[in-house]
A protein has these predicted regions:
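Glycine-rich FAD cofactor-binding loop and adjacent beta-loop-alpha segment at the N-terminus
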Residues: 3-6, 10-68
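Conserved N-terminal helical subregion
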Residues: 52-56, 64-157
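Conserved FAD-binding catalytic core of PHBH/FMO-like flavoproteins
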Residues: 125-128, 132-229
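FAD/FMN-dependent oxidoreductases across multiple families
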Residues: 203-285
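Short beta-strand/turn micro-motifs composed of small residues
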Residues: 9, 32, 73, 132, ...
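Hydrophobic "anchor" residues on beta-strands that sit immediately upstream
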Residues: 5, 28, 126-128, 248
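Short, glycine/acidic-enriched loop or turn micro-motifs at the edges of active sites
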Residues: 35, 135, 255
């Protein structure tokens, strides 16, 4: 029998949406395939609301809290400091490992997952929800128009050690059309995760390795790369409409932005919260 709702996607957002539907007794299945992992390199930064949302779903999180964010402009003397205490919060953000979260979500949604071969007839499904831009599922998502922009940048992410940075602090610096952010990860002393956005003209792994010491000097610490370096091309995309009759977009399928904003999954979780609430209202009215 076909589910009332089908969420389509291969990442974290699709599985989170399915779990939230299940928690609210909404009939939902996930059209997905084997998850893609990143060798424990990729990380996610959650705001306090998103962190509490995952806790509400019973997800176990090994998170590295950020209580302060320090932003520098390397060509001047400007510094902006943000503190959780100033906002009355325990922390400003939490850094978690992407692979660990996806692996846990994949296990929690096993009984809800369906393959394309299992769901060939979509006529009895009331609502299809698209949760990412996985090319495997692009054929299902053809009724939406998007506004897109190429940032002409590549983001490099990797783990690093830094001996003089404070444990619960995140640091961000702007220089030469580049953005460098370093944040705590794994609750291991002096271990951090880095996201470094570099113009495509000179964005290479060699450039990253050759210039990491300069970033360390700007932050008054030594920074040493540890392990693999991942690279992602950066662009933004926003749907002109998020919902049409029988179809909705959430998370990366609806909008994607520069990692500078730190919104990523946070916006996706907000989408999930709002859309499932609308489903609950419709269900209470017998729709």
């Amino acid at each position: 029998m076909s589910p009332e709702c089908l969420v389509i996607g291969n990442g974290i957002a699709a599985r989170l949406f399915a779990l939230e539907c299940k928690r609210n007794i909404i009939d939902c299945a996930v059209l997905t395939s084997s998850p893609v992992y990143f060798n424990q390199v990729r990380t996610i930064t959650l705001n306090p609301i998103s962190f509490k949302f995952l806790q509400k779903l019973g997800i176990s999180l090994n998170a590295s809290p950020i209580s302060h964010i320090n932003v520098f402009e390397s060509e001047g003397t400007g510094v902006i400091n943000f503190s959780a205490q100033d906002l009355g919060e325990d922390n400003l953000a939490y850094v978690i490992n992407y692979d660990n979260l996806l692996r846990q979500l994949d296990e929690l949604t096993k009984d809800m997952q369906r393959s394309a071969d299992e769901i060939k007839d979509l006529s009895n499904i009331k609502v299809r929800v698209f949760a990412d831009k996985d090319k495997k599922f692009s054929k299902y998502q053809t009724d939406f128009d998007f506004i897109e922009h190429d940032y002409d940048q590549i983001a490099f992410t990797f783990h690093a050690t830094a001996s003089k940075l404070q444990r619960n602090h995140a640091y961000q610096t702007f220089f030469n059309n580049q953005i460098f952010a370093i944040m705590p990860i794994n609750d291991i002393k002096n271990t951090f995760t880095v996201v470094w956005s570099i113009p495509k003209d000179f964005a290479t792994e060699e450039y990253v390795r050759d210039n990491i010491d300069l970033l360390g000097q700007q932050l008054d610490t030594d920074i040493a790369i540890s392990g693999e370096i991942l690279a992602f091309e950066l662009s933004s995309s926003r749907a002109k409409e998020y919902c049409i009759p029988g179809k909705c977009l959430i998370a990366d399928s609806a909008h994607s932005f520069h990692p500078l904003a730190g919104q990523g999954l946070n916006l996706g979780i907000a989408d999930i919260d709002v859309l499932v609430d609308e489903f609950k209202k419709a269900k209470s009215k017998g729709r």
